């Protein structure tokens, strides 16, 4: 009954809010997820305990809780609980690990005396029949000795449920009472015959459990975590605060203007790379505290115990509604995890406090009511976040993603902007609000940094940054994380998380202010790319079956019994087609080294970082490819050298000092050192024989000798490849035949020009391995100047070939093998002094059309993207890499992107002859589809006019500050303790603009407000912002075009940035500077200092240390 009433209330409220347009112009309603099938009662809480001595026990199941009638609950109110109330009050004030503040009267740590008057009465009945299976899923097979926390997500098909569970190791104090009395209380209170006794043995999943209780399920997307929880959510810590204060990472730009934005992304890539080891998380997130701070712990008496908390969302039967909620859940996972941590803190407090109560029935009443209160808050927060009306078209994101209607957007925005300047700037209200937003939401700073081209071009092309796009491809990070950090303004140093709330009874006015602010709250636009089949496989193609595992919960024949059904169904996987026979005959010997990549994973996501760049072991797949077989005349000789392979014994060979160049697979550098007979016998004889016989990787010459395992022993995972026995022999024979034919060709053609063939056979979609070919030989200076360059780039695959054109007749002798070599950009440039890559400064940021070039007898195979079945070269944009990818509209072009553009021009101007031959590379037949307006943080956390205050939203409006006053302090503390960005946060900030009182205040987690009438400190209006508003107003009154006025606005913002640069340069080397000195020397007024200091913190962290 109660949930139904709440549902009606919420639906009514949500409907009223949804009818409100998110901005004054009458257009389509603001989008929100459909919540008609999603109710508060669909969110279920399950708490489990696993103890060495007692086994597994259900500590709480919200489905087993029923609210008792007031009359039946009247007797229980008269029991005195004064003594325990004092104990609980002390424990709530001393428990610092919880995120809920005990200062607020409604908090979970309130006194029991207060609870005595308002404590709702609940009856805890027998838990549902599926708790045993769910408990098995929650705990899994993690050992009791494991100290860290584990996070899992399960999707149960029937009935449709999504379960997120977190398992903590419990820490207990030995002198503060036993935790067993709570479970004993449940057994005591459930001796009621109608409710049924809660038999401990029945729900004890300890050593005496039966096979029928075992459950099996396949986790979705996020397997159980190791000590570091960051891997699963994809939202990990970026830099710690200390790392932002040290010398910044050099960006590709000569200017350090974007160092913080660029550096955050680069450090993010480093932090989330498994190659750099596991970063331990904060201990408060790893453990579940059952001890008060005043209790001492006796290690001899503490037994191992784990607490598991699980939130289960019951989904609608309709697939579209399920898909909507899953989209919402996985895209907003950091917010779910943050609120789950808050719920965990409430459960910790409830468990600690209820132990002080001696009477069993009261203990359970207190515990259950506290957990139901915490669950109610969790339910309300998630439901509001799901159903809140969003701003349909945020100005900045729409302007950056929609170029066709940019003029109309500029006109509409400018009209609303001028209205606010003229009507709302009473008491400098609007100037104060804009000052606060520009001071704390700092993602606008990288968008106004200076660029080399004219301002009109700068404004129209500001939506992308080539250098950051290049970084996203070579050192991937989660784009949702980057977007969330931009929105919260977590760019400066120290890192601050900022939210803005506009309060007012005038709905239209609040909506107008929210709409205008979406121009200044900037973030990256995201584009979602998905792979799909393109056409049916031809008869020459290999068709292999992958496996799809479906888990369902079915009703059993016995009453109240359920069991798990695991269905394994076959579905076709993306496979590479076999090359046409005619094409294959013209090719050089078939290459035989490749790294196996699991489906849907880009190799650049597997840990390619500027440090320790290495290639995967070559023996990982029976189907192989390599690069750079060289056919040549037999009168001179080449020897491979400089090979690096990924091996623990050879880690020191990996490059340590390097730039952000992508990892490379380098074909051996070769010099004319040995005579022809020695090389021919060494390469063509022994080595090729060994390759044909066992198909193992060639050992590195300079690493420890080891016997590589034969390829037949490779284990093939579900959907990864076909059986090696099916095709191994035929491929080996075919390779031998081609090698023999190649040998005959060497002997017959003494004067033939050399040719090189780059082949790649790729069995999995999404391979992003990067190859660089580097042929080095002793040549004359004129040869050095005649070296050409071919850059072929598609879908993360790069083959850069340098060759000497003038002396090709001297290039001869067979090059029979090529191996992967890890090399960074800096080392590559050092090692190619003889043949220099002209203009090569790193990976190009745009694709060069892939063509086969035949020049001086040199044949280079072109990449045909995705193995198009028709054989046509479909040269797609490189932006179609099949994964979520950040266009990074929040980052402007860097100063030095001219060198990247020069590289592109060089690549496009490379001469190509008309007789170039196209050779199709065998890549999966698939096509990429892109969705620009995916429902991400940028469009989800910028909300409209809401019925109540919301803690997660970056921007929203509401009619009253009543709930804001109650919750704000606890929310700010929680944000610092459990930040959604998963990195240390120095300060949490909330900007509160009240249109009824015309005040703008800033509340922070660091300063306590002494005035009870105020929520925070008043904002000091910046003279820079005031003059900006006046100049825009004057230009508008002169009837200048809207886009010109917007350009002027951008110029004024850039002027603020340049003043902050000037301030940082002046303060360099100083320890203390007086404000009057700054005013006289730099012309900076005192009311501008907070704004300019905040801007300077994005590029010069020392400024804040000097001035603050």
Swiss-Prot record:
Residues 1044-1099 form the dDENN FNIP1/2-type domain. This is Folliculin-interacting protein 2. It comes from the Eukaryota. The gene is Fnip2. GO terms for cellular component: cytoplasm; FNIP-folliculin RagC/D GAP; lysosomal membrane. Phosphorylated by AMPK. Binding partner of the GTPase-activating protein FLCN: involved in the cellular response to amino acid availability by regulating the non-canonical mTORC1 signaling cascade controlling the MiT/TFE factors TFEB and TFE3. Required to promote FLCN recruitment to lysosomes and interaction with Rag GTPases, leading to activation of the non-canonical mTORC1 signaling. Residues 89-112, 209-233, 598-635, 649-671 are annotated as: Disordered. PANTHER family: FOLLICULIN-INTERACTING PROTEIN 2, RE13835P. GO terms for biological process: intrinsic apoptotic signaling pathway in response to DNA damage; negative regulation of cell population proliferation; negative regulation of transcription by RNA polymerase II; positive regulation of TORC1 signaling. Pfam families: FNIP_C, FNIP_M, FNIP_N. It is found in: Lysosome membrane; Cytoplasm. Residues 540-905 are annotated as: Interaction with PRKAA1. Keywords: Cytoplasm, DNA damage, Lysosome, Membrane, Phosphoprotein. The keyword Cytoplasm applies. Belongs to the FNIP family. InterPro entries: DENN_FNIP1/2, FNIP_C_dom, FNIP_fam, FNIP_mid_dom, FNIP_N_dom. GO terms for molecular function: ATPase inhibitor activity; protein-folding chaperone binding. The keyword Membrane applies.
């Amino acid at each position: 009954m109660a949930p139904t009433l709440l549902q009606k209330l919420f639906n009514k409220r949500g409907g009223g809010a949804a009818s409100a347009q998110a901005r004054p112009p009458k257009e389509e309603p603001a989008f929100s997820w459909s919540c008609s099938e999603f109710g508060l009662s669909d969110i279920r809480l399950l708490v489990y305990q696993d103890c060495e001595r007692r086994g597994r026990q259900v500590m709480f199941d919200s489905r087993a809780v029923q609210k008792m009638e007031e009359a039946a609950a009247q007797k229980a109110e008269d029991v005195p609980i004064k003594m325990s109330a004092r104990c609980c009050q002390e424990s709530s004030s001393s428990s610092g690990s919880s995120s809920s503040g005990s200062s607020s009267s409604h908090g979970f740590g309130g006194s029991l005396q207060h609870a005595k008057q308002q404590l709702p009465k609940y009856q805890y009945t027998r838990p549902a029949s599926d708790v045993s299976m769910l408990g098995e899923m929650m705990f899994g097979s993690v050992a009791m000795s494991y100290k860290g926390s584990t996070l899992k997500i399960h999707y149960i098909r029937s009935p449709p449920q999504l379960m997120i569970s977190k398992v903590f190791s419990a820490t207990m104090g030995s002198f503060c009472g036993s935790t067993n009395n709570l479970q004993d209380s449940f057994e005591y209170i459930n001796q009621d015959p109608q409710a049924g006794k809660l038999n401990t043995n029945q729900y004890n999943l300890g050593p005496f459990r039966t096979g029928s209780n075992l459950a099996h399920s396949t986790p979705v997307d996020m397997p159980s975590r190791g000590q570091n929880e960051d891997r699963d959510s994809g939202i990990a810590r970026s830099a710690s605060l200390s790392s932002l204060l040290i010398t910044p990472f050099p960006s590709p730009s000569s200017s350090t203007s974007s160092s913080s934005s660029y550096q955050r992304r680069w450090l993010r890539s480093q932090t989330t790379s498994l190659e750099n080891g596991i970063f331990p998380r904060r201990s408060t997130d790893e453990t579940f505290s059952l001890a008060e701070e005043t209790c001492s712990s006796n290690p001899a008496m503490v037994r191992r115990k784990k607490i598991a908390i699980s939130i289960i969302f019951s989904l609608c039967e309709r697939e579209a509604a399920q898909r909507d909620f899953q989209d919402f859940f996985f895209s907003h996972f950091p917010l779910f995890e943050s609120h789950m941590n808050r719920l965990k803190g409430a459960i910790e407090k409830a468990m600690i406090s209820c132990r002080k109560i001696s009477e069993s029935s009261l203990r359970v009443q207190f515990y259950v009511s506290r957990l139901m209160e915490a669950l109610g808050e969790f339910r309300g927060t998630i439901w509001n976040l799901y159903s809140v009306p969003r701003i349909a078209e945020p100005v900045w994101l729409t302007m950056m993603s929609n170029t066709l209607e940019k003029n109309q957007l500029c006109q509409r925005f400018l009209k609303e902007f001028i209205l606010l300047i003229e009507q709302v700037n009473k008491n400098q209200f609007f100037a104060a609000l804009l000052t606060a937003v520009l001071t704390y939401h700092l993602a606008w700073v990288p968008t106004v940094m200076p660029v080399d081209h004219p301002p009109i071009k700068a404004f129209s092309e500001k939506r992308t940054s080539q250098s950051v796009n290049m970084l996203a491809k070579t050192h991937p990070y989660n784009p949702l994380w980057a977007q969330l950090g931009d929105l919260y303004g977590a760019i400066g140093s120290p890192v601050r998380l900022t939210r803005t709330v506009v309060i007012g009874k005038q709905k239209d006015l609040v909506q107008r202010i929210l709409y205008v602010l979406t121009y200044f709250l900037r973030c990256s636009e995201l584009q979602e790319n998905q792979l799909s089949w393109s056409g049916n496989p031809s008869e020459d193609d290999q068709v292999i079956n992958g496996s799809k595992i479906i888990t369902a919960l079915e009703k059993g024949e016995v009453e109240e019994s359920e069991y798990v059904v695991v269905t394994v169904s076959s579905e076709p996987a993306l496979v590479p087609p076999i090359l046409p026979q005619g094409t294959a005959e013209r090719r050089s010997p078939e290459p035989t080294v490749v790294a196996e990549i699991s489906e849907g994973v880009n190799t650049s996501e597997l840990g390619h970082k500027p440090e320790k760049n290495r290639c995967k072991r070559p023996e990982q797949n029976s189907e192989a490819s390599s690069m750079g077989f060289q056919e040549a005349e037999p009168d001179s000789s080449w020897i491979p050298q400089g090979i690096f392979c990924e091996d623990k014994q050879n880690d020191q060979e990996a490059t340590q000092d390097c730039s952000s160049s992508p990892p490379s697979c380098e074909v051996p550098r070769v010099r004319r050192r040995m005579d022809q007979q020695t090389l021919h016998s060494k390469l063509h004889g022994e080595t090729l024989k060994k390759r044909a016989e066992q198909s193992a990787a060639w050992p590195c010459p300079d690493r420890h000798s080891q016997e590589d395992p034969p390829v037949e022993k490779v284990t093939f995972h579900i959907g990864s490849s076909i059986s090696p026995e099916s095709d191994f022999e035929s491929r080996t024979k075919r390779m031998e035949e081609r090698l023999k034919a190649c040998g005959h060709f060497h002997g017959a053609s003494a004067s033939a020009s050399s040719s090189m063939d780059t082949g790649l056979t790729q069995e999995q979609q999404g391979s992003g391995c990067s190859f660089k070919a580097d042929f080095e030989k002793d040549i004359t200076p004129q040869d050095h100047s005649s070296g050409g360059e071919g850059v072929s780039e598609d879908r993360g695959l790069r083959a850069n070939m340098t060759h000497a054109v003038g002396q090709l007749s001297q290039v001869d002798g067979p090059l029979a093998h090529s191996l992967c070599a890890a090399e960074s950009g800096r080392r590559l440039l050092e090692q190619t002094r003889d043949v220099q890559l002209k203009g090569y400064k790193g990976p190009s940021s745009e694709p060069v059309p892939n063509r086969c070039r035949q020049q001086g007898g040199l044949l280079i195979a072109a990449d045909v993207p995705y193995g198009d079945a028709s054989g046509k070269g479909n040269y797609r944009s490189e932006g179609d890499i099949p994964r979520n990818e950040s266009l990074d509209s929040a980052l402007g072009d860097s100063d030095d992107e001219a060198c990247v553009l020069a590289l592109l021009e060089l690549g496009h101007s490379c001469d190509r002859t008309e007789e170039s031959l196209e050779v199709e590379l065998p890549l999966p037949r698939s096509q990429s589809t892109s969705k620009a307006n995916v429902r991400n943080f940028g469009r989800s956390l910028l909300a409209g006019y809401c019925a109540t205050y919301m803690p997660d939203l970056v921007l929203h409006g509401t009619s009253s500050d009543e709930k804001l006053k109650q919750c704000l302090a606890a929310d700010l503390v929680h944000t610092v303790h459990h930040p959604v960005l998963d990195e240390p946060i120095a300060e949490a900030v909330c900007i509160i603009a009240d249109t009824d009182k015309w005040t703008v205040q800033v509340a922070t987690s660091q300063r306590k407000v002494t005035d009870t009438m105020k929520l925070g400190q008043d904002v000091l209006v910046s003279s820079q912002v005031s003059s900006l508003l006046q100049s825009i107003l004057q230009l508008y009154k002169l009837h200048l075009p809207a886009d010109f006025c917007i350009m002027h606005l951008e110029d004024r913002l850039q002027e603020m940035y340049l003043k902050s640069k000037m301030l940082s340069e002046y303060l360099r080397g100083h320890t203390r500077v007086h404000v009057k000195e700054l005013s006289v020397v730099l012309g900076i007024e005192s009311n501008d200092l907070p704004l300019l200091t905040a801007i300077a913190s994005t590029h010069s962290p020392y400024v804040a240390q000097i001035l603050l």
